[in-house]
Amino acid sequence: DAPGDEARAWAVRLGVELVEAPRPGSWADLVGQVDEVVIAPGVPDRHPVFAAARTAGVAVLDESDLAFRWDDRPRYAVTGTNGKTTVVTLVADMLERSGRRVIPAGNTDTPLVAAIEDPEADAFVVEASSFRLGHAERFRAAPAAWLNFAPDHLDVHADLAAYEAAKARVWEGIGSPADAVANLADPVVAAHAP
């Protein structure tokens, strides 16, 4: 996809050069000219940009990596095959009712990089889909919850193991095992619990 007007405006504000998708077969030339590649959520694992980045030794980042780089306010995360949006909404509502100013972000209507623009927010409740987790350099949120696991999104991930590995990344950046919220009744989630 070509960047829209909003993406172009963001790029100008951040001093980022946007580059259009190259002709098929020329990904290596393009990726070899950049320091980092930032992937939009949902780009399939089979996309040629990943092979080109590996070959060139170029880091592949997710929009959450940029948000973490630019903002250090607390982030709470929820992942799972089902129920993410409901739990994110409930957690955000509970935090708001306790006096915190939070923004639901991530796989919601608001990307985390947009949510961090709000200077009034105390924290962010991130709906962490496998699309966001799978290509993040290092996902960081605490606490982080994994609700459940079932086969899904095999049109985006290389296989079921890649989908599972993406979900498990929700706990990579927690400070302590006590920051992991795990549904131990789900055998896949339990197998990854810290």
Regions inferred by a protein language model and the residue ranges of each:
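Short, intrinsically disordered, charge-balanced linker/junction segments flanking boundaries
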Residues: D1, L18, A191-P194
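NAD(P)-binding Rossmann-fold cofactor-contacting core
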Residues: D1-W10
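Charged, low-complexity, helix-prone segments enriched in Lys/Glu/Asp/Gln
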Residues: A9-W10, V19, D71
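Generic structural signal for hydrophobic
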Residues: W10-A11, A53
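Glycine-centered loop/turn motif at secondary-structure junctions
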Residues: V12-L18, G57, G99
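Glycine-rich, highly charged phosphate/nucleotide-binding loops
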Residues: L14-L30
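Phosphate-binding loop of NTP-binding sites
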Residues: W27-G32, P41-L184, V188-P194
